[in-house]
A protein has these predicted regions:
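Short, conserved beta-strand element in jelly-roll/cupin
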Residues: 50-54, 64-82, 120-124
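Conserved short histidine dyad/triad with adjacent acidic residue
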Residues: 30-34, 49-65, 100
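A short, N-terminal "cap"/entry segment at the start of jelly-roll beta-barrel domains
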Residues: 1-45, 130-167
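Ligand-binding loop in jelly-roll beta-barrel domains
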Residues: 42, 80, 100-127
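Short hydrophobic/aromatic patches on the structural cores and recognition surfaces of FHA
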Residues: 77, 93, 107
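Short acidic-glycine-tyrosine-enriched beta hairpin
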Residues: 85-100
Length: 167
């Protein structure tokens, strides 16, 4: 008997109860079934998850990352990817890249059946998520998440910071 993870996850065999019900805490239109794939298969440095999103819903909300690159691959169904101000129809077979510090993005299920997609990216202990629609950012750390109102945030140059000129 081995304690090694099975490197093959048969996603077609997954049942709804194998996933985690997920709602983004800042988006009332968020609803998804969230299936972790990379950890059960033994990956530690990258994450890959499968999301099943019902019609009219989205898994996350308009956001971008400052530390982690992200991607999505549509497996079933159809939806609309919002990337910046652009709204683009997506369907099975489409790959979408979300580069570091790129445009804010989200994927909405605009179809009539569940939208199933893989999403993943880098797995770092820290990340910063920016939510432009609500003017907030989240700092993801190993011990929790800090939610910051961007209206209260101040930006300093390196010269100001190191000179202690924070007034």
């Amino acid at each position: 008997m081995t304690d090694e993870p099975n490197p093959i996850i048969r996603t077609r065999a997954l049942k709804p109860e194998d996933g985690l019900p997920f709602r983004h805490p800042l988006n009332p239109n968020s609803e998804a079934q969230f299936f972790r794939l990379s950890r059960p298969a033994g990956l530690q440095r990258a994450h890959v998850n499968m999301l099943r999103v019902p019609p009219g819903k989205e898994a996350f909300m308009l956001h971008r990352h400052s530390v982690q690159e992200e991607w999505s691959y549509i497996v079933e169904g159809e939806g609309t990817a919002q990337i910046g101000e652009d709204r683009i129809k997506v369907s099975a077979g489409d790959f979408i890249a979300f580069p570091l510090n790129g445009k804010a993005h989200t994927i909405v299920n605009t179809g009539t059946r569940d939208l199933v997609y893989l999403t993943g990216g880098e797995d770092t202990p820290y990340d910063i998520g920016h939510f432009p629609g609500i003017h907030k950012m989240a700092v993801f750390k190993p011990d929790g998440i800090e939610l910051i109102d961007e209206g209260n945030a101040r930006t300093y140059s390196f010269q100001q910071w190191f000179a202690g000129d924070l007034g």
